[in-house]
Amino acid sequence: MKNTGEAGELALSVLVQSILRMPQVLCKMPLKTNPEVHYHGADGVYGKYDTATEKYCLYWGESKIYSDISKALSDCFDSLKEFLTEEGLGNTRKERDMSLFRANLDFDDPYLEAAILEFLDPENLQYLKLEYRGVCLVGYNEEAYPKDLSKIEDEIYTEILNRVSDFKSKIGQRLINRTPLDKFVVEVFLVPFANVDDFRDQFQSLI
């Protein structure tokens, strides 16, 4: 099976920035191609200031694109739990991501950059207003897609929506099964594919 990590990371980035309107503050792909940086962290980190809670929220991103949605959900949440609930200081993967984040922070607006750095400084009072969250992309084979032209587009759309509604309860239960992950804010994108292997091949042909 070809590695589609980059495809998932790119799709996650597009969805988070276009739909959730959150900028990506740490991108995994440039770090992986930098020989001076050994990176095995999240599939990107995104940030926004939440006016409701008055906190700066960092979203750790995870993407999994499998043929089976159950395995994709489980692996995605397992990875996310390791990042968000990992305890200890200094040498955890979350802390290593934070160090890379601080070192590679690069915004066009120097005032925005300075403000964000205040939230990342443990010695600054703003650090108490930093909140960790999660965002996931789960891609899977959707059986509602026909293998021929026997269904019209509206029919396929309705079937997929109904199945996604069924998946919602499964998502909630999987988060509860991975407590304390269920205590965190976690955004989930479900992306149905006609065939994930075809998607892999097409993506690989473009890079």
PLM features: residue spans?
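A short, glycine/Asx- and small/polar-enriched loop/turn
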Residues: 37-41
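Active-site ExK catalytic segment of metal-dependent nucleases
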Residues: 55-83
